[in-house]
Every structure is written in C-alpha cells, then in structure tokens.
Amino acid sequence: MSTQTGYLLVVEDIPDILNLLEATLKFKGYRVVTARNGEEALDVIHKERPDLIIADILMPKMDGFSLVHRLRINPETRRIPVVFLSATYVAPEDKAFAMSLGATRFIEKPVDLPTFLPIIEKILQQGVPTSVEPLNEYEFYDGYRKRLEIKLSQKNTQIARDERLIDTLSEDEKVAFKKSLEQAIEERKDIQALLDQIRERLENTTPRHKPS
C-alpha cells in the first residue's frame, strides 16, 4: 500500500457512502474528518483548514453548491480545492455550474475508487489552485434556481412515468418498484424545499450588474 499525506474533509449525508470514503481514504494514509452537511463542514473548516474538500451536492441544511459558494466569497477559504460527488446533478449544465462556482473536479456517483483515488492524489500534488473569481450572490442564486427547476421537472416526469408503469408489473416486481418510487418522491420533496429557499433568497437579493 502506498501511503499518502494530506488533511481531507469529506462532506456527505448518506452514512454508507460517508463511511466508505472515510475508511478508504484513511486506509490510504490520509487524515480525514467528516461532516454531514455544509453547515457542519463550515464549522470544521473554521477550526482547521483542510487541504482538500470532497463534497456531495444534495444535502440537508446546507448543500454542496451553497457550501462552495460560501468558501469562494471568503478570501481565507477561496483557494481550498473542492471535488464534487453527485448522482443527481450529472447533466453537462450541472457540471458547468459546479465549475463556475470554483469546483476543482466533478465526479459522478457511484464512485469508482480505483479512478477516484488517483484524482485525489493528483490534486493534492498540484498544490493550491489558482483563485477563481466568485459569482456574486444574485448570479449564484439565479444559476442555482435554474438547475433546481430543471431537476424538479425531470423528477416530476420520472414519478408520473413510474406511477403509470407500476400497474403493469407483477406483485413481486411491485415491491421493489414501490421502494424506488417512494425514494423518488422523497427526492422531489427535497428538491422542492431547496428550490423554495433559493427563490426566497433570490427575491431578497439585488442584481449586481457589471459596469459597461
């Protein structure tokens, strides 16, 4: 086993994924601390700044996009590299928005560890990245709103399709399918709740136009 060095913060709300990443990275020799959402992550960062942050996007209290935006508008944390992990935000437009926030890399779930670990090692070897000009508050919330509205529309389409399909399945098939449908409905609730929050913040944010 090749031993690596570095202080990593892993931010993930799903316990199984969080535990897997923590155990794997510790096994490789990294010092690892964990958080379950963006708010916890900011508390950890305030105590000791990590060399690299690995963060999910869709999380309660404070999601990954908001976490990175907060980091980038603070000069003291602006240059901490961040790797996004996501199973929900995987469209090219989602990735483009993530990179516009200042993400270093974007990796789709499920995480392929043999690919993931060399990426982490390479980022740490490259050192502190070039500082990215952060989006202003209005640009951030407006861009995020657009992403969430698309996600909500896609989730509604998926649920409507699955609800029509379930009546055509056998009883055995329905059991597993219902669990998947229930999960999709919960995800829709999370997306809608977050969208409501972003819309409210957007209404209270004044657009800041760049000088012509």
Regions found by a protein language model. Name each.
Residues 2-16, 21-25, 53:
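Conserved acidic segment of CheY-like receiver
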Residues 34-43, 64:
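Helix N-cap/capping motif at the beta->alpha junctions
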Residues 43, 65-78:
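Short amphipathic alpha-helix used as the core "switch/output" element in two-component signaling
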Residues 56:
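Active-site residues of response regulator receiver
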Residues 59:
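Receiver (REC) domain active-site loop signature in two-component systems and cognate sites
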Residues 66, 89-107, 115-118:
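Alpha4 helix (beta4-alpha4-beta5 surface) of REC/receiver domains from two-component response regulators
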Residues 111-120, 132:
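C-terminal output helix
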Residues 126-186, 190:
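CheY-like receiver
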